[in-house]
Amino acid sequence: MEINTVLFDLDGTLINTNELIISSFLHTFETYYPGKYGRKDAIECIGPPLTDSFKRLDPERVEEMVATYRKHNHAHHDKLVEPYEGVYETVKTLHEQGFKLAIVTTKIRETAMKGLKLFGLDEFFDVIVALDDVENVKPNPEPLEKAMNALGAKKEETIMVGDNSHDILGGKNAGVKTAVVGYAIRGEDYVRQFDPDYVLRSMPDLLDIVGVKAR
């Protein structure tokens, strides 16, 4: 069957929040554990919900650390977030061609909307499934299934596009096709080991996969 539905991860996929996220983790690490953790540790934390990352450090202070992270993140958001080349044009083309589009992210809705609006992507998405909308996050299929239900989509006509293992595994668990961006911060070799159906060198590659000619 032809693909008519695209579920997108947000961070590291549609918008380049890598330096913002790393900066926010480093700020939080330094606040609670001065000199103990560095950039590599911050990169390891990218992907899962904040609560999972901070729970490994100190289960007793998770909420406090999440609040510290988010305060720094929101304060520096617009300065550190950057667009990825070809993303806006690709999403716009899919929207104009009548594709069903949704965001499936482990961010809270407020922060997700902040990123989408920064680059004018919010107008293309009627469905956003965020951390505060689900009981279970990727790689559990719940958020993907919730997005598909909201869109009236069939799994055999859907593809999940992301930049990390939980996006690929979440797609597989939901029974949909998967695509991963080759510009993922952990590198293409890392994401390939999770066996995505497609690897995108850049976002416009997605148009070929779903049968749309780039303009």
Curated annotation (Swiss-Prot):
Magnesium found in the keyword field: yes
GO annotations of cellular component type: cytosol
Database matches in InterPro entries: HAD-like_hydrolase_sf, HAD-like_sf, HAD-SF_hydro_IA, HAD-SF_hydro_IIIA, HAD_2, HAD_sf, PGP-like_dom2, Pyrophosphatase_Ppax
Keyword Nucleus: no
UniProt keyword terms in alphabetical order: Hydrolase, Magnesium
Enzyme class, UniProt record, top EC level: hydrolase
Active site: D9 (nucleophile)
Pfam families found in the cross-reference section: HAD_2
EC number(s) recorded for this UniProt protein: 3.6.1.1
Any single GO BP term: DNA repair
Essential cofactor(s): Mg(2+)
Catalyzed chemical reaction(s): diphosphate + H2O = 2 phosphate + H(+)
Protein family: Belongs to the HAD-like hydrolase superfamily. PpaX family.
UniProt cross-references to NCBIfam families, sorted A to Z: HAD-SF-IA-v1 (TIGR01549), HAD-SF-IA-v3 (TIGR01509), HAD-SF-IIIA (TIGR01662), PRK13288.1 (NF009804)
Protein's UniProt name: Pyrophosphatase PpaX
Highest classification ranks of the organism: Bacteria, Bacillati, Bacillota, Bacilli, Bacillales
